[in-house]
From Swiss-Prot:
Recorded superkingdom: Bacteria
Binding locations of S-adenosyl-L-methionine: 273, 302, 307, 323, 350, 371
GO MF term list: 4 iron, 4 sulfur cluster binding; iron ion binding; RNA binding; rRNA (uridine-C5-)-methyltransferase activity
Family: Belongs to the class I-like SAM-binding methyltransferase superfamily. RNA M5U methyltransferase family. RlmD subfamily.
Recorded name of the encoding gene: rlmD
GO annotation terms (biological process): rRNA base methylation
Active site location: 397 (nucleophile)
Organism: Aeromonas salmonicida (strain A449)
Function statement: Catalyzes the formation of 5-methyl-uridine at position 1939 (m5U1939) in 23S rRNA.
Protein's name according to its UniProt entry: 23S rRNA (uracil(1939)-C(5))-methyltransferase RlmD
InterPro entries (alphabetical): 23S_rRNA_MeTrfase_RlmD, MeTrfase_TrmA_AS, MeTrfase_TrmA_CS, NA-bd_OB-fold, SAM-dependent_MTases_sf, TRAM_dom, U5_MeTrfase_fam
The TRAM domain, residue ranges: 10-68
Key words of the record: 4Fe-4S, Iron, Iron-sulfur, Metal-binding, Methyltransferase, rRNA processing, S-adenosyl-L-methionine, Transferase
Amino acid sequence: MAQFFKPQKKSTQPQRIEFTVDSLDHHCVGIGRHQGKAIFIEGALPGEQVKARILDDKKQYAHAALQQVVTPAANRIAPFCNHYRECGGCNAQHLGEADQQAAKEAGLVSLFERLGQIKAPVLEPVLTGESRAYRRVCRLAIKFDKNGRCTRVGFRRRQSNDLVEIEGCPVLAEPLSALIAPLRECLNRLKSQRELGHAELIQAEQGIMMLLRHTGRPNEADRALLVAFAKSQGIDLYLQAADERIEPLHQVFQPSYSLDGLSLAFAPGDFIQVNGPINQSMVAQALAWLGASKDDKVLDLFCGIGNFTLPLARQAREVVGVEGDLAMVARAEENARRNGIDNARFYKADLSGDIVGMSWAREGFDLVLLDPARPGALEVMGHVVKLSPKRVVYVSCNPVTLARDSQVLVKGGYRLVRLGMLDMFPHTGHLESMALFEQ
């Protein structure tokens, strides 16, 4: 009788390995090698012998979960947060702040030289601030537990979509951290618990603003409970529906923040930097590097609500701000009016598309500043080169796209003159940086 070949089923057991960590990447993630393959592992430090479980096995590399540190590094420290082992909010509390910054700086230089093929200059001093209670913005995950029949509030678990319930967070501004427990208590009293999405907390100068995602239509009883909660906590509360519409449920103040003597108003859903003091330092450094005078016309791309535009307008002859979100363009215009600035103009434009035919794009500019989101600004870089400004300052929250986009400037005749890191997000793998290019 013929025998048919039956391939053996692949084992579903996760592979467990032991190896030595050699270095850290710019996310403060450990890198080692096992059987010739690069292994990325959070929570491990250079020099450590570790035991790990493979999570995601690719041809050239793999991601692994730390199970045991066999030989700890001398610079390993105890995390200051009780939730650190589980919570995915921070990933570098086991490393001192100076070592975190050094790893990120080394990663920044490596990305420029390896990915961008650009020789990095000696880095500028890191812009630093407080490393705890620094976040003025956070997004809390909310999940209804069917088994416990209760609503849980916290952050996503490390390397998972599960939720870690927390009582407080030491990197949040203290008023935001103190709001978590009473918020959980309030949400557990709602009839519409299953329809809750997430809650965004923002610390404005006037107080706390909360944007609560609600995918249904809360009844009058739930609305009354939420309003009572907002009043008792002294916060403003907005609801965001599934179609993204935002409804003020309890509004007392117009949120704003101060910047270099200016007052910048914002609204729920607007982007603002999470670290207020570092934002102040960042804007001051960008203005100093750009060096605008009363003879200069400046272009500010991805301008948001005017975070760089309005301080620049006090130095330059004229500033043009361009932003893809129409609501933030309107907010930037209002911020110019409320601060008595009449030499700033704002336009809405999709900066990932073709901008050649736009009126502002045909104007001449002496200086350019850009501060794009994580995807970077590749589509607009060629046009920046064509404008031929004297200097370009690029502020970035993603060093990978910064290094990539910088190639366009260098090939267009610009030199990378200054490069530095801003410690906007201590204890995390996020890296903010700034680069200056000159013709």
